[in-house]
Amino acid sequence: MGAGLGADSALGLPGENLQGVHGAVAWIEHMKLAKADMGAVKHAVIVGGGNTAIDAVREVKGLGVPSVTMLYRGTREGMSGYQHEWDAALQEGVSASWQSLPVAFEGTGRVQRVQCVKLDASKKPIAGTEFTLQADLVLLAIGQSKLGDMLASLGGITVNKGVIQVNAHGFTGRAKWYAGGDCTNGGKEVVNAAAEGKAAARAIDAAIMKGAARA
């Protein structure tokens, strides 16, 4: 099994249903299909600090948006995204607002502004530090939902915190069922999924050959 993860996670903030506010993964997929209309976008805000956020920042900047800001609740040193990718993004002209949190999206029909607040070291809002960012486009790169309920319904496998529990060979504990990728590791890189798929394939091949030898 390589079920991956579910839809982009949401923040549940006021104005999140405005046009122009999207999940980053869904937007990137849409953009790759050449369906993203960026003609009217002058200011973009990407919420998050992982590799998806950096991918989104660079894609948006590469499409010619003049002002692109990454809004992250932590510090640069604490972000999970690769530092070399962020260094490249800086060279391309993006900016960041560290230790910052969106509290509302505003606009008439379409997003125009993001209301934000600064955070202290414990990630608690600091009174009196509210600020506003202009935004024609907001992308939420705060993770993806896990398919725990669906996976658990399969029966015969163990699901913990939304991901399938497997051994080093991808075996789920249910006869002939192997899994790998985001549905087992919670969301890593393509290279991780490929490596886990190969490990499972080798284990499956070994099991088949062992059965053939017995026959």
Regions found by a protein language model. Give the residues of each.
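Cofactor-binding loop segments of dinucleotide-utilizing enzymes, especially the Rossmann-like FAD-
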Residues: 49, 72-75, 182
